[in-house]
Every structure is written in C-alpha cells, then in structure tokens.
Amino acid sequence: MEIDVKLTASPKAKPQDESNLGFGKRFTDHMFIMEYEGGKGWVNPRIEPYHRLSLDPASSVFHYAQEIFEGLKAYRADDGRILMFRSRDNCRRLNRSAERMCMPPIDVEFNYGCLLYTSPSPRDKRQSRMPSYA
C-alpha cells in the first residue's frame, strides 16, 4: 500500500521547554488519515498538514458512533532520541479494541510505519522515503 505524504509549509514553533509538555496540549504538524470502504478495507492512507475536520451534520458518527482511543506519547531523551513506549503494541491494542467494537482491524505493520514517519526525529528531519507495505 502506498501512502501520499504532504508536509506542512509552515511548521509550528517548537516548545521552549520540552520537559514540560503536558498531555493533550501540543500536537504534531501532521495527521495520518485513512478511510474504510466495505469490500476493500482500509484505503487511501495519507499524511497531511494538521487541519480542522469538517463533518456533515447527517454524519452517522453523530447518531450511531463507535470509537476507539489509544493514546501514545512521544518524548525526547537526554541524548536527543525520540522515545515512544511500546508503540507497536499500541497498534495491536487498537486492533483488540476494534474487534470488541465490531470494527475492521488496521494493518499493524503499515500503521506502525506511518506512526514512525509522523514522529519527529532528533533534529526534525524526516526520512527521505516512507516505508511501503504490501
């Protein structure tokens, strides 16, 4: 599966004090989006600049919503590396939750690769290529 990557033209200012980020207050410059189509599964994966979402008032999410939340926090170690605690396991937990909610599973390895791609590197430089998974 290929992924379309569009990086932001105006990155957010980096926090002055990375040791005091808090939770749910700072967000990345990008977001990972993928749709589900019956008979095809998860399709159209892409990374886009962070933006607001627009929803039709008739969207079924407002009337028959199912949701899964799997929080994951990344932080910078003293040596400059970005650390995430068991992020691949986080993708697996998402699938266990999806099964319980009768929702379609994600491809763990593909989504893990997207997670690594959207996470900042020690000097905010992205890899030159996005991993591709069949």
Report residues per predicted region.
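Conserved small/polar residues in nucleotide/adenosyl-binding loops
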Residues: 117-124
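Conserved phosphate/anionic-ligand binding catalytic regions in large, soluble enzymes, centered on
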Residues: 58-72
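Residues forming anionic-ligand binding surfaces in small-molecule and nucleic-acid pockets
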Residues: 71-75, 82-101
